[in-house]
Amino acid sequence: MPLTSTPDEPLPVRTISRALGDWISRLGRVWVEGQVTEISRRPGMNTVFLTLRDPVADVSLRVTCPRAVCDAVGPGLVDGARVVVWGKPSFHPGRGTLALAVVEIRPLGAGALLARLERLKATLAAEGLFAASRKRRLPFLPTAVGLITGRASAAERDVIENARRRWPAVRIELREVAVQGPLAVSQILDALSDLDADRAVEVIVIARGGGSLEDLLPFSDEALLRAVVAARTPVVSAIGHEQDTPLLDFVADVRASTPTDAAKRVVPDVSEQSALVEALRSRARRVLAHRLDLERRRLADLRARPVLAAPLREIDRREQTVGALRSRSLRCLTHAVDVAERDLVHAAARMRALSPAATLERGYALIQNADGAVIRSPAEIEAGDPLTVRVAGGTFAARAE
């Protein structure tokens, strides 16, 4: 109901403030469009504070929202971004200020594009398409370089001129395509497929100059990004300037900051390589000369040794030593044989002297009984026992009496 007041019965400030608060609270949630001018994310707090300014009038509104709501928007929620928010307005009587508690934020224009690209980036990153482990090494000196760029563009000129300046014999397979607009993605995909099928092409450069976020959108297209990942040939992204970062930069095997930088990355500099070869030659010469000098000194040291001053002298000395040892060994051997021969003669004489046959030769006889036992005493036989008598000339029978 309307408030009534008179000069004599004015309404207190608190009454007006409470009435405004009650009326505003009945509005419910509303959609509000504005421009973000200030964001405050305080560490440890789940509430984010920001200011929303009217894009036409000089009017601003204090906004609060949960941190998760702001995080869901992504990097597009920055100062200057235009957004549409859904929230419930409230009036604080104590401060006399109007605020908006927001539960949803939707970016407009570039902010919406950035949010969509951020979601795609997160999806591809989760699939591992940005991982360094899947990046392929560029060939040192490619047989041919594939170049996908705009017709008669500055990017085309920069890549070709710098590549041929660095390596005059480089072969460029050029595919001119639309680099912005609705036809760009399909033409780039066709050119990529064509160059990837050419076995002579060992690296592909996708290049264009700088541009607005909308101009560079084809190079963040999901179909193109997945085609680059699936390509057999390494791909170099050379889109825009240093500050431009389309999603192609993340899936490409190498990201070049500019088209000129791409040319430097895909082919070596002939003058640098010539200087490197010459430096390696000089180093090889120095190493070889040092080794030869070292071996010469070693050979001179060997030749300076006394033994090499008269090499036959040592051989003669060794020959004399061998001759003396030979003579000594012959003398020792002859002496040993003589001693052994004398010992053998003495042993044979002793054997003959101690032999029973020698005793028999001296006229003795050996008497044995019938069992063959030697008779050493007459008591060992009886009269009539048969005996065998062995003399030097043989044996004969006898009988005891």
Curated annotation (Swiss-Prot):
InterPro entries: Exonuc_VII_L, Exonuc_VII_lsu_C, OB-fold_nuc-bd_dom. One of its GO terms (cellular component) is exodeoxyribonuclease VII complex. It comes from the Bacteria. The keyword Cytoplasm applies. The keyword Cytoplasm applies. Signal peptide: none annotated. Bidirectionally degrades single-stranded DNA into large acid-insoluble oligonucleotides, which are then degraded further into small acid-soluble oligonucleotides. Heterooligomer composed of large and small subunits. NCBIfam families: xseA. This is Exodeoxyribonuclease 7 large subunit.
